[in-house]
Amino acid sequence: MTQFASPVLHSLLDTDAYKLHMQQAVFHHYYDVQVAAEFRCRGDDLLGIYADAIREQVDAMQHLRLQEDEFQWLSGLPFFKPDYLNWLREFRYNPAQVCVTNDNGKLNIRLTGPWREVIMWEVPLLAVISELVHHYRSPNAGVDQALDALESKLVDFTALTANLDMSRFHLMDFGTRRRFSREVQQAIVKRLQQESWFVGTSNYDLARRLALTPMGTQAHEWFQAHQQISPDLATSQRAALAAWLNEYPDQLGIALTDCITMDAFLRDFGIEFASRYQGLRHDSGDPVAWGEKAIAHYEKLGIDPLTKTLVFSDNLDLQKAVELYRHFASRVQLSFGIGTRLTCDIPQVKPLNIVIKLVECNGKPVAKLSDSPGKTICHDKAFVRALRKAFDLPQIRKAS
């Protein structure tokens, strides 16, 4: 299936902020590290028929480059350094790093190359896949239907929060990777800008063009890669946390907790890390149990939870965000990142549950175990066993 009308992507910055944040850290500290990443569809969708169309879009991405106005805008942000931005100015996507195949109806994608370059593929490639699939499956859906659905949800949201103090409710758009389309995401974000509780977007292109705050710190791959970068597997998570602070000592201080599991994370998150990091991000498992563990951990360390922020970003919608806000608002600072339920929330449209995750670093396996067993990713069962042993994990989790 080919012949999509035009390139889906129009800007190098049409990606999530944490990709550039991580890329700068990789550029400075792990310039020669090599990685491999693979696509997974967690649903039952057979997406192999779109392989040719995806390959065309991958080839078109080599023409994307950082424009002068984009360079100047990034230069005005407090956390990017000139050497990295000058390098990014010359960056071009290399389609040779991407292998796209149709395996009897199953879509297979494998990315290989230097981490500093491969890191850029995940978010825009997932956005391309999502937009292509929805273009063919739902040709008559689009911005109008998405905005109608959002307005309906906002009416319910207003009723749900009528008697709530919403002054500490902060919502972010995290919807780039599984959006219905670029146009839908932009329309949704522009509408949400009218709400006082909407504080920003993870999409750097939208943040620049709509004068929003870009949101994001690091992803699972940062912790996964350190499983092989660090000489000691048992201390790899601490090494990842320390390396992040080395690059960003006073900003971008939200740590992702579920690469190994929350319990394993908290064992590594001692007083120095807990004091220096601004807060934590939830991305799998029971959000209430996770939040209670986080608050208890801060209290045990003698840190006032109200000085820290918990970011919830796992499969959220507006109603779930309000429920979590009701539960936690008086005890800790809160932010909520909503993705698919904002940017692909259209009647009769089935969002794709798709990811691209790191599977190797320097030719050796890495794993994401998470707090939701269905999200576990690793080819090498022996490595998963070693990881469990290193982090003293009691529960055996099936690698997929």
From Swiss-Prot:
Q: What does this protein do?
A: Catalyzes the synthesis of beta-nicotinate D-ribonucleotide from nicotinate and 5-phospho-D-ribose 1-phosphate at the expense of ATP.
- Please give the family membership noted in the entry: Belongs to the NAPRTase family.
Known EC number(s)?
Answer: 6.3.4.21
Which PANTHER family does the UniProt entry name for this protein?
Answer: NICOTINATE PHOSPHORIBOSYLTRANSFERASE
> What does the UniProt PTM comment say about this protein?
Transiently phosphorylated on a His residue during the reaction cycle. Phosphorylation strongly increases the affinity for substrates and increases the rate of nicotinate D-ribonucleotide production. Dephosphorylation regenerates the low-affinity form of the enzyme, leading to product release.
The answer to whether the entry has keyword Phosphoprotein is yes
Name any GO cellular component annotation: cytosol
Please identify the protein, giving its name as recorded. Nicotinate phosphoribosyltransferase
Q: Part of which pathway?
A: Cofactor biosynthesis; NAD(+) biosynthesis; nicotinate D-ribonucleotide from nicotinate: step 1/1
Say which domain of life the source belongs to: Bacteria
Where are the Phosphohistidine residues found in this chain?
Answer: H220
Q: Which reaction does it catalyse?
A: nicotinate + 5-phospho-alpha-D-ribose 1-diphosphate + ATP + H2O = nicotinate beta-D-ribonucleotide + ADP + phosphate + diphosphate
InterPro entries per the UniProt record, alphabetical: N/Namide_PRibTrfase, NAPRTase_N, Nic_PRibTrfase, Nic_PRibTrfase-Fam, Nicotinate_pribotase-like_C
NCBIfam families to which the protein is assigned, alphabetical: NAPRTase (TIGR01514), PRK05321.1 (NF003704)
Gene Ontology MF annotations: nicotinate phosphoribosyltransferase activity
Species annotation: Salmonella schwarzengrund (strain CVM19633)
Q: Which keywords belong to this entry? A: Ligase, Phosphoprotein, Pyridine nucleotide biosynthesis
Q: Which GO terms describe its biological process?
A: NAD biosynthetic process via the salvage pathway
